A protein has these predicted regions:
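Ubiquitin-like/PB1-type beta-grasp interaction modules and other compact soluble beta-rich domains
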Residues: 1-65
Length: 66
C-alpha cells in the first residue's frame, strides 16, 4: 500500500492508522498537525483513522519559538 505523505509517495503496511504512521516516522511524541485527505484531524482521532491505499497526508511539526 502507498500513501502520499507531504507530496511524496510513501509505502506502508495495510491497515495502518495515523498513530502507527507517526510512530514509524519517529513523531509519536511530537506536537504535530495531521491533514488526512484535506481534512485536519484532532489527535483523539489518530487511533481510529485507518489509512487506505492512495490516501493523501500532510504532517506538520509544531516548533515553539521566541
Amino acid at each position: 500500500m502507498s500513501v502520499t505523505l507531504n507530496g511524496n509517495g510513501h509505502p506502508m503496511p495495510a491497515d495502518n492508522t495515523i498513530t502507527g504512521l507517526l510512530a514509524s516516522l519517529g513523531l509519536a511524541d511530537k506536537p504535530v498537525v495531521v491533514e488526512h485527505n484535506k481534512v485536519a484531524l484532532f489527535p483523539r482521532d489518530y487511533d481510529s483513522t485507518v489509512l487506505e491505499d492512495n490516501d493523501s497526508l500532510e504532517i506538520i511539526t509544531i516548533a515553539a519559538g521566541g
